[in-house]
Amino acid sequence: MLMPKRTKWRKQQKGRNRGKSFRGNKIEFGDIAIKAVEAGRIDSRQIEAARITMTRKINRTGKTWIRVFPDKPLTAKPLETRMGKGKGAVDRWVMNIKPGRIIFEMAGVEEELARAALTLAIHKMPFKCKIITAKDSHELY
């Protein structure tokens, strides 16, 4: 599971996820990638599930890059607990995703197989995504 080794503060405020992604919106390493079409939050477990499905589909050939890292703690109070008595404990780690953000990249795999693997990974995402290639990378959204 992806999570920071240490953070300055244990808990964060929720914040807002607005606007479009101006960082991490172009293919940097691979030939084909998954790009977010709408805003959402991705969990470390969802990233890991997508990574496992992709690597199994491509039979561990080629190279895959994970371009997102969950660095925001999400807290939750235990079930059947009354309100009050402080903020809950850290439940999981997430990252806010804005439209246009590249999530995974892949190289060294033939395009048909890469598309099949990335399609399986898209089904694990909690928001709409699309597959783009390096020549489409200049399109922002």
Curated annotation (Swiss-Prot):
GO terms for molecular function: rRNA binding; structural constituent of ribosome; tRNA binding. The keyword Ribosomal protein applies. GO terms for biological process: translation. Pfam families: Ribosomal_L16 (PF00252). Residues 1-23 are annotated as: Disordered. Keywords: Ribonucleoprotein, Ribosomal protein, RNA-binding, rRNA-binding, tRNA-binding. GO terms for cellular component: cytosolic large ribosomal subunit. The keyword Ribonucleoprotein applies. Coiled coil: none annotated. InterPro entries: Ribosomal_uL16, Ribosomal_uL16_bact-type, Ribosomal_uL16_CS, Ribosomal_uL16_dom, Ribosomal_uL16_sf. It comes from the Bacteria. SUPFAM superfamilies: Ribosomal protein L16p/L10e (SSF54686). Binds 23S rRNA and is also seen to make contacts with the A and possibly P site tRNAs. NCBIfam families: rplP_bact. Belongs to the universal ribosomal protein uL16 family. Part of the 50S ribosomal subunit. PANTHER family: 50S/60S RIBOSOMAL PROTEIN L16, LARGE RIBOSOMAL SUBUNIT PROTEIN UL16M. This is Large ribosomal subunit protein uL16. The gene is rplP.
